[in-house]
């Protein structure tokens, strides 16, 4: 299986409010950037949207190392998700996106690594800037 790195970040202005997401996918010396946003959302939803949209791009099963400054996303992938499924996602927020994650992550092996946000990690900083730009686009449509 191919080794892929995914860096992702989500932003929400107001939380909830206008939001944006960005992800960088790296394979060897190739890089792909994706981004987008929504009119009314949360930072956690945008973080998860970034990951899901990145996974949709992959055409074959991969070993994925995910880097995120979201403890929510990293803990969910590495620890909580199995328990959530056993309890049929009772009291879990963003169930729609977690169920989508389960679908788009099928066949992949994913290890999520938490990185401290706003701490000079180049790819995280890039994703953060792109996600904020996407969120700003939606501010103009809500005023």
From Swiss-Prot:
Keywords: Cytoplasm, Endonuclease, Hydrolase, Magnesium, Metal-binding, Nuclease
Gene3D superfamilies: Ribonuclease H-like superfamily/Ribonuclease H (3.30.420.10)
GO biological process terms, semicolon-separated: DNA replication, removal of RNA primer
Cofactor stoichiometry and binding remark: Binds 1 Mg(2+) ion per subunit. May bind a second metal ion at a regulatory site, or after substrate binding.
Binding, Mg(2+) 1: 9, 47, 69
Entry-linked InterPro entries: RNase_H, RNaseH-like_sf, RNaseH_domain, RNaseH_sf, RNaseHI
Main location group: cytoplasm
Necessary cofactors: Mg(2+)
Known role: Endonuclease that specifically degrades the RNA of RNA-DNA hybrids.
NCBIfam families per UniProt: PRK00203.1
Full protein name: Ribonuclease H
Record lineage: Bacteria, Pseudomonadati, Campylobacterota, Epsilonproteobacteria, Campylobacterales
